[in-house]
């Protein structure tokens, strides 16, 4: 969940990560995105710590030694299992049934970067691995709608100035 929310990666990108794709020294990770397109994303402290903690605690696999995330059987974790883990985490935190999905975590990451990280749409396009800026702009329009709705929902929104 830390990687989804901090990096905005796709589910397929997460399950495809190999240990050899992570460069802790340069704080970056190589992802294989849509259309087998490679991209590098940089990791913040939360991601570095989560990855280091996970690697230290995970069992090594003879079957797939380079796969980062493993199933209990020592194989690369499946997309479905990641979805189940996310759902289990949501249930444990009381957030289950609220329409949150793995893909919504990606949307949330993009929205947070755009709103609070001073990340422009071109940079966000590269981080998310979008082919077209139009796809990225969906996230920014969503953010602007949220901001407009927030302004409109103010209890002071309907107070009018009295003319003197």
What role is predicted for each listed range?
Residues 1-12, 28-29, 111-112, 155:
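Short pre-functional
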Residues 99-103, 139:
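Catalytic tyrosine of NAD(P)H-dependent dehydrogenase/reductases that use a Tyr as the general acid/base
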Residues 7, 11-12, 16-53:
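Conserved tyrosine-mediated DNA breakage-rejoining catalytic core shared by Y-recombinases
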Residues 35, 128, 132-153:
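Catalytic-site neighborhood detector that most strongly recognizes the C-terminal catalytic loop/helix
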Residues 2, 6, 106-130, 138:
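C-terminal catalytic core of tyrosine-transesterase DNA break-rejoin enzymes
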Residues 45-96:
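Active-site/catalytic core of tyrosine-dependent DNA strand-transfer enzymes
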Residues 10, 18-20, 96, 131-134:
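Short coil/turn motifs that cap or connect alpha-helices
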Residues 155-164:
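C-terminal secondary-structure termini that scaffold catalytic or DNA-interacting sites
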């Amino acid at each position: 969940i830390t990687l989804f929310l901090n990096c905005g990666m796709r589910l397929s990108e997460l399950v495809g990560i190999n240990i050899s794709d992570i460069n802790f020294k340069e704080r970056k990770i190589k992802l294989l995105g849509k259309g087998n397109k490679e991209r590098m994303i940089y990791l913040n402290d939360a991601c570095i710590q989560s990855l280091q903690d996970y690697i230290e605690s995970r069992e090594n696999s003879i079957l797939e030694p380079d796969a980062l995330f493993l199933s209990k059987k020592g194989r690369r974790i499946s997309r479905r299992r990641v979805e189940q883990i996310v759902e289990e985490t949501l249930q444990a935190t009381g957030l289950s049934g609220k329409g949150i999905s793995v893909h919504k975590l990606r949307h949330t990451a993009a929205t947070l970067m755009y709103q609070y990280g001073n990340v422009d749409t071109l940079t966000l396009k590269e981080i998310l691995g979008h082919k077209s800026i139009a796809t990225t702009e969906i996230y920014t329009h969503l953010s602007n709608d949220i901001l407009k709705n927030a302004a409109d929902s103010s209890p002071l929104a309907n107070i009018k100035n009295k003319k003197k």
